[in-house]
Amino acid sequence: YYFELGDDEKAATAMARAASLPGAPESLARLAAKLFVSANSPEQAVELLAKVYAETSDEDVRKSLEVRLKESIVERDLRSLEQAIARYQAHYSRRPDRLENLVGPGLLRELPKEPFGGDYLYEAATGTVRSSEVAERMRIPVRRRARQP
């Protein structure tokens, strides 16, 4: 689905099914999480990784999954913050001065906590938000096959 059809959501669903099979390598769950994020479904990535983490007894694998789970939570939170910034801008015709302005009716109930113990940093001039602890957003760096006309 990913390479041939460019359908990240179907690819993520298929990969998640494969990751849930007995004996499946944990790398499948990590890839499925990235695909869910790529398909604009970071919440599904969080759910999948939390499930695999809970079912895994190998401590090394659990450590790896915990990092990926936290990265998925960061991605989910960043998208939530970006959406709230867009709603704020649509309502007030300007960007918020700070993230705290996003807490209120129609926006956010509260600001999310950065799971690595850092902060979510906001650049009011550009409207960008990032984690102080995660250098890069979750992306899949692989090129897709070119579609034939």
Regions inferred by a protein language model and the residue ranges of each:
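Low-complexity, acidic interaction segments enriched in glycine
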Residues: 1-21, 27-149
